[in-house]
C-alpha cells in the first residue's frame, strides 16, 4: 500500500510538517495532489483530505464534539466509563486504547481522569492524533486532560506483547474497524468513509484480543456495533448493551477461573 503523502499548505509550519513526516514515515510533497487521499497541514490543524465528496477528517480534543463531551458527557455513568470499570472506582485505571483511531474514546476516558495510552499502527491516524494532542496541550481548557494522554505509534499486538510486568495496563480497550455492511450507517458517517478507506479494516482482531487478554491486569473491553458479532476465539465474561453500540467485557479473573 502506497504511503499517504503530507502536503504543507502553510509555509510557516514547514518544520512541523517535516517533524511529522520523520516521526511517522510519511512522504512530504510540494504540491497539493490532484486526486487520491493526502494529509494537509494548514494554519490550524492537520487534516486527511480527498478530491471526492468526503469532508476533511481530523482528530479534535478541544472544540466541537470534544468540547461537548468534556462539558456535558455524562461522567462515570456513560457507557464507555461503565465498561472500563469507572463507576464507583476509587483508583482510576491505566487504559491502553489498542485501536486509538481518532482518539474519541481515549479522550473521554482521559477527561474522566484515566491515564490513557493511545496505540495506533496507522501512520495517518497516528499523525492526526499527534497533531490533536499538541493542540490540546497548548489550550488551557484541555492541557490537564492531554497530560494524561500518551501516543504510541506501533502495532498493538507487538506493543502489548513487549510490555514488562510493571508496564501492563489495567484495562485494554479495543474498537476494531470492521468492513461496514450497513449502508445507512455508512451514509451517516461520511467523514469516516475516507478514514476507513485509508486506514483499512482490522483483519487480525482475534489475535489482538488474545494479546490484550494476556497483557491486561483487570479487563479487556471490546466496543462493537450493538448487533455485530463478537470477536471469535474467547466468549465475553459480560456484555454491556447501549443504544447503537455494546461493550463485550473480558474480565481477567473470570477468564482465569473459567
Swiss-Prot record:
Its EC number is 2.1.1.242. It catalyses: guanosine(1516) in 16S rRNA + S-adenosyl-L-methionine = N(2)-methylguanosine(1516) in 16S rRNA + S-adenosyl-L-homocysteine + H(+). Keywords: Cytoplasm, Methyltransferase, rRNA processing, S-adenosyl-L-methionine, Transferase. The keyword Cytoplasm applies. It is found in: Cytoplasm. Gene3D superfamilies: Vaccinia Virus protein VP39. Specifically methylates the guanosine in position 1516 of 16S rRNA. This is Ribosomal RNA small subunit methyltransferase J. It comes from Chromobacterium violaceum (strain ATCC 12472 / DSM 30191 / JCM 1249 / CCUG 213 / NBRC 12614 / NCIMB 9131 / NCTC 9757 / MK).
Amino acid at each position: 500500500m502506497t504511503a499517504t503523502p503530507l502536503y504543507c499548505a502553510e509555509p510557516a509550519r514547514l518544520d512541523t510538517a517535516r517533524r511529522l513526516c520523520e516521526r511517522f514515515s510519511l512522504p512530504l510533497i510540494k504540491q497539493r495532489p490532484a486526486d487520491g487521499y493526502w494529509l494537509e497541514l494548514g494554519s490550524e490543524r492537520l487534516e486527511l483530505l480527498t478530491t471526492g465528496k468526503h469532508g476533511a477528517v481530523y482528530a479534535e480534543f478541544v472544540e466541537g464534539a470534544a468540547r461537548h463531551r468534556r462539558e456535558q458527557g455524562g461522567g462515570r455513568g456513560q457507557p464507555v466509563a461503565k465498561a472500563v470499570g469507572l463507576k464507583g472506582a476509587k483508583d482510576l485505571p491505566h487504559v491502553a486504547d489498542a485501536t486509538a483511531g481518532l482518539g474519541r474514546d481515549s479522550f473521554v476516558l482521559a477527561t474522566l481522569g484515566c491515564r490513557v495510552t493511545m496505540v495506533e499502527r496507522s501512520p495517518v491516524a497516528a499523525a492526526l492524533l499527534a497533531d490533536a494532542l499538541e493542540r490540546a496541550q497548548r489550550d488551557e481548557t484541555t492541557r490537564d486532560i492531554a497530560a494524561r494522554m500518551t501516543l504510541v505509534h506501533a502495532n498493538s499486538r507487538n506493543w502489548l506483547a513487549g510490555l514488562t510486568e510493571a508496564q501492563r495496563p489495567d484495562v485494554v480497550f479495543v474498537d476494531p474497524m470492521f468492513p461496514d455492511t450497513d449502508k445507512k450507517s455508512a451514509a451517516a458517517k461520511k467523514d469516516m468513509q475516507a478514514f476507513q478507506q485509508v486506514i483499512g479494516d482490522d483483519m487480525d482482531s482475534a489475535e489482538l484480543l488474545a494479546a490484550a487478554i494476556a497483557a491486561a491486569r483487570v479487563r479487556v473491553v471490546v466496543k462493537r456495533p450493538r448487533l455485530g458479532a463478537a470477536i471469535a476465539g474467547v466468549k465475553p465474561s459480560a456484555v454491556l448493551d447501549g443504544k447503537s453500540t455494546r461493550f463485550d467485557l473480558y474480565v481477567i479473573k473470570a477468564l482465569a477461573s473459567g
